[in-house]
Amino acid sequence: SSVDKLDVIAALDRLGVHYTEYGAPGFDPAAEKLSRLTLPVTRSVPVAFGMTCKKGLMPDRDENLRALVECPTPTLTLVGKSHALQVRDVLKTDLDENLRIIEQSVAYATKNDKTVIFDAEHFFDGYRYDAEYAVKTLAAAVRGGAKVLTLCDTNGGALPDDVKEITARIVERFPEVRIGIHCHNDNGLAVASTLAAVKAGATHVQGTLLGIGERCGNANLSTLLPLLVRAGYVSGIDLKLLTPVARTVAEITNITIPDFYPYVGAGAFSHKAGLHADGILKAGGSFEHVDPASVGNIRQLLLSKEAGKHLLIAKLKPFFPDIAENAEGLKRIARALKEREDAGYTYEAAEASFVILAGKILDRDVTRFEPIGYSVTNTSDEPECTASTTIRVGDVTRSASAKGLGPVHALDKAMRECMLNFFPSIDKVSLIDYKVRVINPRSATGAAVRVLITTTDGRHIWKTVGVSEDIIRASFDALSDSYHFALSDDFDFYFG
């Protein structure tokens, strides 16, 4: 929507991106609306996108091109064909007509006081097919007044070495304008090809945050920007905002950033194996090529059965300050961690459950209540369920029932009802994510499941885990751990 686009434009502007292409007025209603607004930018130049005029038409007779030129945006991107085969087989016109289309369309825009970026579609494939004609299309754009010639790997199959060689030739051929690069990621090399073009002299880079785009996506700016800034090719980018802005865009576009994404993924600076985590604890940069904070991310030390002593101490010290002196306790915790991971538990993302487990092993229970039992019923075809739970706080036992949309929702409501009289602060706590994974699917209906629950109090987020052959039991255990953690005395200290 236009509102979503405004939010993305504002986020990219905060990051310091130099140009923000917001869409095609005349084709996209949201872009049409934006073209009439004052955009929320202080550093970025808004760019409207469109195509050259249709064959057989003069530019001022093409409704879409005229609408593009009439919008108040001072900079336009015009895309035109640079592949002779595409001109004949897709545009269904002759090569000279395509050159006329390019030159006159660009000239029409520049005569109307627009700065034109010319995107040469299918340029690298076109250059390999007919290099002389591909270069002629660029020359036509320059005659029309284009300030930037963007070489497009539209099919996403070009190799970095070829991109570098061809880009260098074009930079030498057209010294009077800037040369740009626009790569798709169909062969997984869009970032590498973009860097190759920059090394060859390209000074205008096109891409998308998180690589969002058709098919396999475009060159990923969340990966490219740190590389370009560190190499000294780009200035004005506030890299400390990279991860927050990437996550803002992901939220707006309703996509999930893969944990393994460089720089901005949740796992980009996560350390699990014993030697790696131990090295990070002793020397912060020993297993990281950049400081996580420099790109707005954070370091995470993940718990697993490979965890070494130093990692266990680092994770447990906020709750058990003398843990470093308790060698026997550390051994028991490490042994329990291995046994429970073998049973299907995972504490990499569920550190809150690990704290609860460690307290019980050390005979220093951090829990404030004891879950006694639960039941869940569903007596109709409707999704609504009824759950009953019982807890004990000191010498007092309390039971409560609640209805919910599904068993987990009902269980959560019943547990909260039980605890509110004892712990009013629980009212601020809410479940925000619930995931289930079958651990051993070959066991079919007897397979164990792992439930991972994410909870927040509005300030902090924590995760807990439960494992059982009964999904309701696994959910109940994960919910119990979540509330145990929220009520622990050192909760705030743990989050710093």
Regions found by a protein language model. Name each.
Residues 45-50:
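A glycine-rich helix N-cap at a beta->alpha junction
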Residues 1-20, 35-37, 41, 54-179, ...:
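Alpha/beta enzyme core
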Residues 460-495:
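Mixed-charge, glycine-accented linear interaction segment located at domain edges/termini
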Residues 8, 232-401, 441-448:
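A mid-to-C-terminal "edge-of-domain" accessory segment
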Residues 155-158, 165-282:
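Catalytic alpha/beta core domains of metabolic enzymes, predominantly
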Residues 153, 207-214, 226-236, 295-302, ...:
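Short beta-alpha connecting loops at secondary-structure transitions
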Residues 374-385, 403-416, 420-458, 469:
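A conserved regulatory-domain signal marking ACT and ACT-like small-molecule sensing domains
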